[in-house]
UniProtKB/Swiss-Prot annotation:
It comes from Lachnoclostridium phytofermentans (strain ATCC 700394 / DSM 18823 / ISDg). NCBIfam families: 1,3-beta-galactosyl-N-acetylhexosamine phosphorylase. This is 1,3-beta-galactosyl-N-acetylhexosamine phosphorylase Cphy0577. Reversibly phosphorolyzes beta-D-galactopyranosyl-(1->3)-N-acetyl-D-glucosamine to form alpha-D-galactopyranose 1-phosphate and acetyl-D-glucosamine. Active towards galacto-N-biose and lacto-N-biose. Does not phosphorolyze galacto-N-tetraose or lacto-N-tetraose. In the reverse reaction has activity toward N-acetyl-D-glucosamine and N-acetyl-D-galactosamine, but not L-rhamnose, D-glucose or D-galactose. Belongs to the glycoside hydrolase 112 family.
Amino acid sequence: MKKDTMLAGRVTIPTDVDVVPETMELLNRWGADAIRDCDGTDYPEELKAVQAKVYSTYYTTRKDNAWAKAHPEEVQQCYIMTSFYTATETTLRIPLLKGIAKELMMVNNYDDKVRWWEVIDRSTAMVVSTDTWSYDKETGEVIITNCEPFHNYTVSFLAYLIWDPVHMYNAVVNGWQGVEHQITFDVRQPKTREYSMVRLRKFIEEHPYVDVIRYTTFFHQFTLVFDEMMREKYVDWYGYSASVSPYILEQFEKEVGYRFRPEFIIDQGYYNNQYRIPSKEFKDFQAFQRREVAKLAKEMVDITHEYGKEAMMFLGDHWIGTEPFMEEFKTIGLDAVVGSVGNGSTLRLISDIPGVKYTEGRFLPYFFPDTFHEGGDPVKEAKVNWVTARRAILRKPIDRIGYGGYLKLACQFPEFIDYVESVCNEFRELYENIKGTTPFCIKRVAVLNSWGKMRAWGAHMVHHALYQKQNYSYAGVIESLSGTPFEVSFISFDDIKKDKNILKNIDVIINVGDGDTAHTGGLVWEDADISSAIHQFVYEGGGLIGIGEPTGHQYQGRYIQLANVFGIEKETGFTLNYDKYNWDAVESHFITEDCTKEVDFGEGKKNMYALEGTTILVQMEKEVQMAVNEFGKGRSVYLSGLPYSFENSRVLYRSILWSAHEEENLHKWYSSNFNVEVHAYVKNNKYCVVNNTYEPQNTTIYRGDSSSFDLELEANEIIWYEI
């Protein structure tokens, strides 16, 4: 197994009892140095002595139904809100589990409902007195008396997760029949906590051949709800609503000194998703969860190290409260983090995590029947996944790559096996070339929103790397940034409020999203400390880029709160009485010089108009889509949307350079063809040119001193040079 490091290593493959010869073959062909099991597979006896690291997935919260059934009061719980129901008379009956899979949840009839449930008159936002409602266990309904006719009502209640949502998802997707539904137990609860430490020790002792415990995960499932037809009903990869129990909430109350309300989690039915501006109470709850999750996870990691094993965390599933970009995470003491790679943004979600010895990306496709079936094209999916993620790897590499699922399925596609072999070799080469150095960054860019670093690289991501029509025009900005030569940070309005001097270490700020959301700020713009800090930043020479409805919030005669900086305002109807005369777009501009066609703004924005003195780059039917403006010594750029594409990445790149007054540095580690990118590693005396497309490309390459040469590249090709 031992090979030259350029020829082997840094790759993890899955296995199962019926693919031992195939596993051994791929250890050599792919140069793998680690083997893992997966949900629904078993580790073969024959491979326990293999000369490779062995990962074993360890489920901290499931795969022990005997314990869960013996302690039903310590099964993990979730806050759920019913649909809105309109009272047509003074009595109203609201069914709690209507629209939810009965296999997934069971109403918590154990704890004090008066204390932990909440009925709200949504027409008045008033909490309904507990004296006027009751729960009918037989029908599963809450009965409200003394209703106000034609008011809307909801019930917020606790339910037990009687089928682990991830296990349910895997069972539905793979068509598993007759499998026992795994119940999610709550490791935070006292009996289960004590038992879990004994259970972990027993597992490690019974698996002496295992080198790495791959924790899945610590300890609360992201919000994932299915309807009666087993379809996804609600999903939030960052959702906290399944991290609750009366036991946890009583601890929270003691720490913060005020009474908990279900509405802190329910949030009118929006569940504090990342588009909602977080309340003080929810931020307090997140901080509490981070501390408690880290404290308990550290106990497990310490046990792992006591046995001489490595502790790896899977980034996903039951990971709520770990928050890898926050300070508490590094106190856990993990050796590694592994996560699924769906694109460049999700690659950076993993590779940028501080405080671990190494990171690993699990690449797509997962070896499941939804891709590996007759007529399926796993090679195409693998190519798209690798080439998309490679941009981000070249900026901040993960340390390892891997695959998961049923190896038997993958082996039925020889072309796929061949392609992944080439990916493994290419990854090892680029890792050797760039390890230990920071690539050349032309400017420092900060994405500004309400979440800051807590949602670094996950901004505008509802479900892991999945497309949403309403936000792809914004998520594309984050994806573009994941592979561009900038030092990227994520800052919050709270960060600026705490110390506006942080802006002195930033060249360009990006504010991207719809108005009155957490991404653009909403109510925060009524705080003069925030608005004046950004005004001053730009006035003194900083760059500001706004996409969508940046700083959008109706207040004091403005919707776009930095309208005088952007030179752009939105017509909401309030300014129809004012005539607008600035509609002429310039024929050319530095930002659009590389565009080969009309700029793709995605969904764009309606009713945006330019103020006097603003330079319009693109307007369509008297609606501004792109414009630039000068404010003091600084510059701003406005775009109505910017979905991810190579051409749009170039538009963003030029926008950043222009707003930072860096036009003269365009031809520095630069490709004239936007389908091709250049990454320089000055410390390692290397640079590479990479073709991001699936066809050959011609380009002119500019080195760091602006000298140039012409180049032809094959499809997907990457070429390395000495500086």
